[in-house]
Every structure is written in structure tokens, then in C-alpha cells.
């Protein structure tokens, strides 16, 4: 290998995407090393086992590829910069997205700094399904080639500088191709299922987990007409548009259409429900977003036409965006949208390019 080979540290999660990313970078002539991050300390045996198994898988892959694996503990950073904010949002009756925060504070901040400063890396790499393109001297974030797996929604907080220091090898591939490469190489992660659940906390029973940190406060479930029809176990367990877990059946009029959460009255600890997933109370004509992050880091002024996603895997919604001030925008959808949820992120696109996004501060309800 030449003296000039650039050094890349791959965030090895013990999953198939980061495993194949490491191999692809080797094929491209980079000097590759891996880094396994431990970001969660609190816990019961179950989570410890998951983390231990993931580390063992990451180590097995690195051994197979002949690369060094470093480990680092970012549990304090995760607790301070991700988890405490996550709890505060739930406490305020909003529904945060911890994966977005984790990418912002851990993977593309703590990891990026550690790789550059402690390990002498030129770049970091992750197994995210996104692409980068350098245009006019700035790195842009593009959707992953596999539209079914595209993860740009979770990376909208990244700046062009962070993207310039990051490589996303699987972003150019479809997921089945990634699995096929792993199988052909005989990697232990080839058939490992994709992780779901909260970022580094893994797949645990969410209600039970949240209950450890936030005391649940039961309260009334009320219909949009003001009838009390049940009791909820805590507003934090419910999100707009939710149907499951309400514990209420049909109505006295006999209609069997399912109930959906349409609003939360945090002040009075009341959950408001209506029947039908397209109930007018569930629809929004737009939203106000704050805590904005634009990938090019240029302040947004005036108005623009683009598309928006108000949750992961949603079909793009055509919209008009208008700057209200330095850190707030108003977004008006071309057509009403269901279940726009405060606390979640609104992420904007111009074709393949992810422009950035912000946190949904409030939804603009359909006038009824």
C-alpha cells in the first residue's frame, strides 16, 4: 500500500452494513481500521449481552478482513447530549427522535473528533444508506441509492464540513447487494437482521424502559366530542396517529372504526382520540419548525419550493417553506398530511439532495 493511502476509521456496529463498508473501502485502496462504540452503560444483563454479541461480531469481521478494531466508550456523552434531552422531550409531551440526536452528537461529533485526533484518521465511514457529492467546493448529502433504505432523514443535522470528512460506501448499493457481498465473503454478519429500536439502547420493551426514568401519570382518554371513554397510563407512551395500545373498543353508536390519538393536552394530562385515520383533527395543513440545520450552513431567507418528510419512510410531500426568523420556518403542504408530530423532525429535499431540516414545534391543524 502506498504511503499516501488515506486512513479511514469505520464505525463498526456489528451489523452487515458497516462490515461491508469496511471491505469496500479496502477495495478502494484506503488504509482501514474499525472502531466499536459503547454508548450505553445503564443496565440489565439483556442489553449487556446484546452489546457483547455486537462487539464479538465486529471483532470477527475485522479479523476476517485483517484490520484492527479499536473500542471507545461514549456513554457519558450519550447520556448528557442524547438521553437527557430525549427524556426532557417525552416529559414535555413531545415525541423526539433519538437516532437523529445520536448521529448529531455521537457518530458525527464524538466519533469524528476521536477518529481524527486520537487515531489520526483522514475520514470516518459509517454503514448509512446515503451518498455524498461535492458541488462548488461543498459536500452535499444525497439520498441513498436504495430508496427503501435511504437514511438521509436521520442525517439532516450534518454540515457540509462533517460530510466532507465522512464516507458512506453502501450508499451506492442496494441492500440485497450488501448482503450478497457479506455472504460471498463469509462474514458472520451476513444474515444478521437490521437493528431497530432506539439507537444504541437496542430493542427493549419501550414502555417498561421509559417507565424506569419517567414516572407515568395516568389520566383520561377523551373523544374529540368531549366524552370520556377510558384511561391512559401516561401521555409519554402515546404519539399522534397512534392506534395500538389505547385499550378502547368501538363506540356506543356501534361503529367499529379504530380510535387514533389526535392530540395531547399536556397541561391537563388528557389524551384526545377520534375514530378513523383520516379524521380532520388528525390532519395538518403545515407546520412550524425550529432548531434548523441546513447542510450548506447558509442562513435561509425568503421562501422556497421543495419537498418535506415529517417522519422516516414517508413519501415526499410537496410544500412551500417560508422563513419566519433566523431559527423558525413555516411549512405549508400542497395537500393536508396526517399525524404531523411535534418533537419529530421535518426534513427537506430538492430532488436527491437533502437540504437540512428542523424540529417540528407545532403543527398547523386543518381548519374544522
Curated annotation (Swiss-Prot):
<keyword id="KW-0694">RNA-binding</keyword>
<feature type="site" description="Interaction with tRNA">
    <location>
        <position position="128"/>
    </location>
</feature>
<feature type="disulfide bond" description="Alternate">
    <location>
        <begin position="102"/>
        <end position="199"/>
    </location>
</feature>
<keyword id="KW-0808">Transferase</keyword>
<dbReference type="Pfam" id="PF20259">
    <property type="entry name" value="tRNA_Me_trans_M"/>
</dbReference>
<keyword id="KW-0547">Nucleotide-binding</keyword>
<feature type="active site" description="Cysteine persulfide intermediate">
    <location>
        <position position="199"/>
    </location>
</feature>
<dbReference type="GO" id="GO:0103016">
    <property type="term" value="F:tRNA-uridine 2-sulfurtransferase activity"/>
</dbReference>
<feature type="binding site">
    <location>
        <position position="37"/>
    </location>
    <ligand>
        <name>ATP</name>
    </ligand>
</feature>
<protein>
    <recommendedName>
        <fullName>tRNA-specific 2-thiouridylase MnmA</fullName>
        <ecNumber>2.8.1.13</ecNumber>
    </recommendedName>
</protein>
<dbReference type="InterPro" id="IPR004506">
    <property type="entry name" value="MnmA-like"/>
</dbReference>
<dbReference type="GO" id="GO:0002143">
    <property type="term" value="P:tRNA wobble position uridine thiolation"/>
</dbReference>
<dbReference type="InterPro" id="IPR023382">
    <property type="entry name" value="MnmA-like_central_sf"/>
</dbReference>
<dbReference type="GO" id="GO:0005524">
    <property type="term" value="F:ATP binding"/>
</dbReference>
<feature type="region of interest" description="Interaction with tRNA">
    <location>
        <begin position="311"/>
        <end position="312"/>
    </location>
</feature>
<dbReference type="InterPro" id="IPR014729">
    <property type="entry name" value="Rossmann-like_a/b/a_fold"/>
</dbReference>
<comment type="subunit">
    <text>Interacts with TusE.</text>
</comment>
<feature type="binding site">
    <location>
        <begin position="11"/>
        <end position="18"/>
    </location>
    <ligand>
        <name>ATP</name>
    </ligand>
</feature>
<comment type="similarity">
    <text>Belongs to the MnmA/TRMU family.</text>
</comment>
<feature type="region of interest" description="Interaction with target base in tRNA">
    <location>
        <begin position="97"/>
        <end position="99"/>
    </location>
</feature>
<keyword id="KW-0819">tRNA processing</keyword>
<keyword id="KW-0963">Cytoplasm</keyword>
<comment type="function">
    <text>Catalyzes the 2-thiolation of uridine at the wobble position (U34) of tRNA(Lys), tRNA(Glu) and tRNA(Gln), leading to the formation of s(2)U34, the first step of tRNA-mnm(5)s(2)U34 synthesis. Sulfur is provided by IscS, via a sulfur-relay system. Binds ATP and its substrate tRNAs.</text>
</comment>
<feature type="binding site">
    <location>
        <position position="127"/>
    </location>
    <ligand>
        <name>ATP</name>
    </ligand>
</feature>
<feature type="site" description="Interaction with tRNA">
    <location>
        <position position="344"/>
    </location>
</feature>
<dbReference type="InterPro" id="IPR046884">
    <property type="entry name" value="MnmA-like_central"/>
</dbReference>
<keyword id="KW-1015">Disulfide bond</keyword>
<dbReference type="Pfam" id="PF03054">
    <property type="entry name" value="tRNA_Me_trans"/>
</dbReference>
<feature type="region of interest" description="Interaction with tRNA">
    <location>
        <begin position="149"/>
        <end position="151"/>
    </location>
</feature>
<dbReference type="Pfam" id="PF20258">
    <property type="entry name" value="tRNA_Me_trans_C"/>
</dbReference>
<keyword id="KW-0067">ATP-binding</keyword>
<keyword id="KW-0820">tRNA-binding</keyword>
<dbReference type="GO" id="GO:0000049">
    <property type="term" value="F:tRNA binding"/>
</dbReference>
<feature type="active site" description="Nucleophile">
    <location>
        <position position="102"/>
    </location>
</feature>
<dbReference type="GO" id="GO:0005737">
    <property type="term" value="C:cytoplasm"/>
</dbReference>
<dbReference type="InterPro" id="IPR046885">
    <property type="entry name" value="MnmA-like_C"/>
</dbReference>
Amino acid at each position: 500500500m502506498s504511503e499516501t493511502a488515506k486512513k479511514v476509521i469505520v464505525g463498526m456496529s456489528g451489523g452487515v452494513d458497516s462490515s461491508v463498508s469496511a471491505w469496500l473501502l479496502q477495495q478502494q485502496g484506503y488504509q482501514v481500521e474499525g472502531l466499536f462504540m459503547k454508548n450505553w452503560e445503564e443496565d440489565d444483563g439483556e442489553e449487556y449481552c446484546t452489546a457483547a454479541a455486537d462487539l464479538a461480531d465486529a471483532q470477527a469481521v475485522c479479523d476476517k478482513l485483517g484490520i484492527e478494531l479499536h473500542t471507545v466508550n461514549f456513554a457519558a456523552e450519550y447520556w448528557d447530549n442524547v438521553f437527557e434531552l430525549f427524556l426532557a422531550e417525552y416529559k414535555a409531551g413531545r415525541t423526539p427522535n433519538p437516532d437523529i440526536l445520536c448521529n448529531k452528537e455521537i457518530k458525527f461529533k464524538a466519533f469524528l473528533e476521536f477518529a481524527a485526533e486520537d487515531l489520526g484518521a483522514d475520514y470516518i465511514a459509517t454503514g448509512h444508506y446515503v451518498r455524498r457529492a461535492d458541488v462548488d467546493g461543498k459536500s452535499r448529502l444525497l439520498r441513498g441509492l436504495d430508496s427503501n433504505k435511504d437514511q438521509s432523514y436521520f442525517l439532516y443535522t450534518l454540515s457540509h464540513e462533517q460530510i466532507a470528512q465522512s464516507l458512506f460506501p453502501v450508499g451506492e448499493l442496494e441492500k440485497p447487494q450488501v448482503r450478497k457481498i457479506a455472504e460471498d465473503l463469509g462474514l458472520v454478519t451476513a444474515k444478521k437482521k437490521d437493528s431497530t429500536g432506539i439507537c444504541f439502547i437496542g430493542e427493549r420493551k419501550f414502555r417498561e424502559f421509559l417507565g424506569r426514568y419517567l414516572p407515568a401519570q395516568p389520566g383520561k382518554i377523551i373523544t374529540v366530542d368531549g366524552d370520556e371513554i377510558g384511561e391512559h397510563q401516561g401521555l409519554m407512551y402515546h404519539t399522534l396517529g397512534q392506534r395500538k395500545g389505547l385499550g378502547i373498543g368501538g363506540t356506543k353508536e356501534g361503529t367499529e372504526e379504530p380510535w387514533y390519538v389526535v392530540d395531547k393536552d399536556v397541561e391537563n394530562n388528557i389524551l384526545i382520540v377520534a375514530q378513523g385515520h383520516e379524521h380532520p383533527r388528525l390532519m395538518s395543513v403545515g407546520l412550524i419548525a425550529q432548531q434548523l440545520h441546513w447542510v450548506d450552513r447558509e442562513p435561509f431567507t425568503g421562501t422556497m419550493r421543495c419537498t418535506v418528510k415529517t417522519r422516516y419512510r414517508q413519501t415526499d410531500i410537496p410544500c412551500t417553506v417560508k422563513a419566519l426568523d433566523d431559527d423558525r420556518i413555516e411549512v405549508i403542504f400542497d395537500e393536508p398530511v396526517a399525524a404531523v408530530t411535534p418533537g419529530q423532525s421535518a426534513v427537506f429535499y430538492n430532488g436527491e439532495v437533502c437540504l437540512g431540516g428542523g424540529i417540528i414545534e407545532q403543527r398547523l391543524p386543518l381548519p374544522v
